[in-house]
Amino acid sequence: MPKKIIVPVGTSKPIAPFSPGTLADGVVYVSGTLPFDKDNNVVHVGDASAQTRHVLETIKSVIETAGGTMEDVTMNHIFITDWANYQAVNTVYAEYFPGDKPARYCIQCGLVKPDALVEIATVAHIGK
């Protein structure tokens, strides 16, 4: 099955050579998603909860554009800049995954823009 590039309306233009999402063989691969507005400015500076919500809404948009739902998510890769934000990220994250939880990991690291506190990359199996 050929791959399909997924670019939801209103998403920011990638700041590097990648697509927001790729659909191949019933699997949606969502690139690392940062709390950016359509002009690649960091939103909700200093607020890990609001940044996490923005990131997850963007991911949701990519998955829905591909024909899936957040219930189709099977794996999340979470990157945070400070463990002090871990609980805030988890609280918002739990709202998006109220039932069975996808596999995931979370690491602390630097991100591409200093005001970004969280980045999430996602895999979803939307079936055939």
Curated annotation (Swiss-Prot):
Species annotation: Agrobacterium fabrum (strain C58 / ATCC 33970)
GO molecular function: deaminase activity
Name assigned to this protein: 3-aminoacrylate deaminase RutC
HAMAP family: RutC (MF_00831)
Similarity remark: Belongs to the RutC family.
SUPFAM superfamilies from the UniProt entry: YjgF-like (SSF55298)
Origin organism lineage: Bacteria, Pseudomonadati, Pseudomonadota, Alphaproteobacteria, Hyphomicrobiales
Function noted in UniProt: Involved in pyrimidine catabolism. Catalyzes the deamination of 3-aminoacrylate to malonic semialdehyde, a reaction that can also occur spontaneously. RutC may facilitate the reaction and modulate the metabolic fitness, rather than catalyzing essential functions.
EC numbers on record: 3.5.-.-
Coiled-coil segments on the chain, per record: none
